[in-house]
Amino acid sequence: MTEAKKSLKRTLVGKVVSDKRAKTVTVLVERRVKHPIYDKIMIKSSKYHAHDENGEYKMGDTIEITESRPLSKTKNWVATRLVQKAGLL
């Protein structure tokens, strides 16, 4: 009975909006929700601080973050992988 355990940690995908702090990136995660009365699709967003040990993620990159133990007062997420590199303007 060697079954692979499913990870209980949440993963989210978002866009890096700030990389000014050492070893930390701020990630904006957007989600779509339907209004319960008016049935309109709304976009809600949340910002998360994620740990970036090597400073490899830059502003505009789309990355995946995974829930972890508290690393500081506001940092409970770790940047795990790059989904899409930021394009040139």
Curated annotation (Swiss-Prot):
The keyword rRNA-binding applies. Pfam families: Ribosomal_S17. GO terms for molecular function: rRNA binding; structural constituent of ribosome. The keyword Nucleotidyltransferase does not apply. Keywords: Ribonucleoprotein, Ribosomal protein, RNA-binding, rRNA-binding. GO terms for biological process: translation. InterPro entries: NA-bd_OB-fold (IPR012340), Ribosomal_uS17 (IPR000266), Ribosomal_uS17_bact/chlr (IPR019984), Ribosomal_uS17_CS (IPR019979). CDD domains: Ribosomal_uS17. One of its GO terms (cellular component) is cytosolic small ribosomal subunit. One of the primary rRNA binding proteins, it binds specifically to the 5'-end of 16S ribosomal RNA. NCBIfam families: PRK05610.1, uS17_bact. Part of the 30S ribosomal subunit. Belongs to the universal ribosomal protein uS17 family. This is Small ribosomal subunit protein uS17. The gene is rpsQ.
